[in-house]
Amino acid sequence: MAKIKGQVKWFNESKGFGFITPSDGSKDVFVHFSSIQGNGFKTLTEGQNVEFEIQDGQKGPAAVNVFSL
């Protein structure tokens, strides 16, 4: 899978999910906290730059292997 760069559109810590806007202008991608790589509490902040891969999930495309940049 190709690595894609993008920016966090929004992320709800209490629900553990949000959306990332890819930098190539394609459709926003769902992200679940379990796909965030790193130690400690897994969360994202609005406007944060990230790198990720896209995988087809049960409800459409989802971001996986999400790394903060």
Curated annotation (Swiss-Prot):
Cystine pairings recorded for this chain: none
- The record lists the organism as Buchnera aphidicola subsp. Acyrthosiphon pisum (strain APS)
Main location (coarse class): cytoplasm
Residue ranges of every copy of the CSD domain listed in the record: 6-66
Q: What is the lineage of its organism?
A: Bacteria, Pseudomonadati, Pseudomonadota, Gammaproteobacteria, Enterobacterales
User: Does this entry carry the keyword Transmembrane?
Assistant: no
Superkingdom of origin:
Bacteria
**PROSITE patterns per the UniProt record, alphabetical:** CSD_1, CSD_2
Q: Which Pfam families match?
A: CSD
**Does the keyword section mention Transcription regulation?**
yes
Query: Subcellular location, in the record's words?
Result: Cytoplasm
One GO CC annotation, please? cytosol
Per its record, how is this protein called by name? Cold shock-like protein CspC
Q: Which keywords describe this protein according to UniProt?
A: Activator, Cytoplasm, DNA-binding, Transcription, Transcription regulation
Alphabetically, the GO molecular function entries are: DNA binding
